[in-house]
């Protein structure tokens, strides 16, 4: 067995770098660290909102590991390493039994807990503090703490935005926000800021209801549109034209808005935050399977019309989106985007295969189901390494695909 594969196997199974007993830094780590720091400074100067988003991602990753570390310590497990980043050490120091530090590549973070499985050698005196020797509830708490922390982060961000900056609130009114000059609505005297009351005798209170009322007619039909121009209600006879983008469909020529920004109180903000998290979790479940599907990656590479919401992306693409959101919506928009990203990452991380946390949770659950009183069952992690290797290979393909698309066909 090669040294590279042995190291790869041990680190995949252990959930982090194998402790070699050294601290400090390496020349390679210092060099790469200086380059990374310079790039962050350059990013802060050239695109402040992108920098804010990237810092938010790094803080989220750090808090993910804090979740693992804190629960491990509270449940009596021994954590020997807590690192931000991967690759060569930039610097590290040891406090007590734990080495803390930063590594050169800011691609994630890890906490090293001893005895994650049967492949992890543990000193006899440390065996009572090994992960594998703890009860199933304690192991499950520690391994899911990272994803739970993402949900806490998302809630705090959603809640903070709703009570300070506010969010969209349904008004029950369809107010014109956009017009196409020369359209049937324009010719009838309807202008931006007017409120549409009814179309063809059907009362409307949202943009969707306006679309539905128009869709009930055919091109060439004349309908009565009642609207409020701010001073009085007016009635206009409008002859609908044909949509150029959807042949055969009637066209009025307005874009209406049925929401407005509103600050929410703590109770309503709590409800909306929980609802946003629940909805994003549901979307993330289907999204994970879509993103992990190699056929989806192939379609994204070969078809420029493939749905952009299904494409794999990297921190490069997400940072581009974060910068654009910051330019248009400011800090509140960036924080909301970070909240959605945290929910997705939390769900993605629970995919039940190594090297995800969900893989460790699945192993712990399998061991619990196979165990009998007085006869604890321990799974052979070595048999799972080929599957974990395939997952890592798939993730590498997704990363390369996402990075290529982020550079060649940036979102937005």
Model segments located where?
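Transmembrane alpha-helices
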Residues: 1-51, 400
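Functional transmembrane alpha-helices
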Residues: 5-29, 129-130, 134, 244-345, ...
């Amino acid at each position: 067995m090669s040294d590279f594969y042995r190291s790869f196997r041990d680190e995949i199974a252990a959930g982090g770098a194998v402790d070699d007993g050294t601290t400090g830094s390496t020349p390679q780590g210092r060099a790469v660290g200086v380059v990374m720091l310079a790039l962050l400074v350059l990013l802060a100067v050239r695109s402040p909102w992108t920098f804010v988003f990237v810092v938010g991602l790094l803080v989220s990753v750090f808090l993910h590991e804090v979740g693992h570390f804190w629960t491990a310590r509270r449940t009596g497990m021994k954590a020997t390493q807590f690192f931000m980043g991967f690759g060569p050490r930039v610097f590290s120091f040891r406090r007590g039994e734990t080495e803390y530090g930063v590594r050169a590549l800011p691609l994630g973070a890890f906490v090293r807990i001893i005895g994650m499985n049967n492949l992890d050698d543990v000193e006899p005196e440390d065996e009572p503090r090994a992960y594998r020797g703890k009860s199933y509830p304690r192991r499950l708490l520690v391994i899911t703490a990272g994803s739970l922390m993402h949900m806490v982060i998302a809630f705090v961000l959603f809640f903070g935005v709703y009570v300070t900056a506010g969010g969209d609130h349904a008004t029950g009114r369809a107010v014109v926000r956009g017009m196409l000059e020369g359209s049937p609505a324009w010719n009838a005297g309807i202008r931006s800021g007017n409120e549409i009351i009814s179309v063809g005798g059907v009362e409307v209170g949202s943009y969707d209801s306006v679309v539905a009322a128009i869709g009930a007619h055919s091109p060439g039909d004349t309908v009565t549109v009642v609207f409020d121009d701010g001073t009085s209600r007016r009635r206009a006879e409008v002859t609908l034209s044909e949509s150029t983008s959807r042949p055969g469909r009637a066209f009025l020529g307005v874009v209406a808005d049925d929401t407005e920004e509103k600050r929410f109180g703590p109770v309503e903000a709590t409800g909306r935050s929980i609802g946003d998290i629940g909805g994003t979790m549901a979307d993330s479940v289907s999204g994970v399977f879509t993103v992990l599907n190699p056929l989806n990656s192939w379609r994204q590479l070969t078809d420029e019309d493939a749905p952009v919401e299904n494409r794999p992306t990297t921190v490069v693409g997400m940072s581009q989106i974060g910068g654009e959101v910051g330019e248009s919506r400011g800090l509140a928009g960036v924080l909301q985007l970070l909240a959605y990203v945290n929910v997705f990452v939390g769900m993605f991380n629970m995919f039940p295969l190594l090297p995800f946390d969900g893989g460790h949770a699945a192993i712990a659950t399998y061991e619990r189901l196979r165990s009998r009183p007085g006869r604890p069952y321990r799974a052979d992690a070595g048999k799972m390494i080929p599957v974990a290797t395939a997952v890592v290979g798939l993730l590498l393909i997704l990363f390369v695909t996402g990075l290529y698309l982020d550079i060649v066909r940036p979102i937005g």
